Amino acid sequence: MNSKPFFAPIDHTADVGYRLFAPTFAELFAVAGRALFDAITELDSIQPNLERKIEVEADDIESLLVAWLSELNFYCITQLELYCDFNIEMISPSAVRATVRGEKIDPTRHVIHTEIKAVTYHELFVRETENGWEAQVIFDV
């Protein structure tokens, strides 16, 4: 496995899916945030001009990933913000606290590919491997 975190789109009928890979649990959540905003727009078009604190809790690691991505998507939809930088400050199997950086949507610079309606549990998994962590997530679009 590559020692750097990365994501790869997967084929999924009518929805958008990603496989996520990272050497650590914290980096898995950072790369998941990048995958979410990759589905929405071009990541390279987002500048880290504003900062937001994000904290979520859940009963297990799969639910934590869904809660994390759902919270990011909530701010995208309600505050019209896009994020490109994800600093995971604290993470456990049931909680994550992070500072995310990005900017307000600028229609002159951001081409919106799709709107994420929901982060789903469909085909979701999060697991530790001998090379680090991997996950799969499907977004309802």
In which residue ranges do the predicted regions lie?
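N-terminal intrinsically disordered, cationic/polar leader segments
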Residues: 1-141
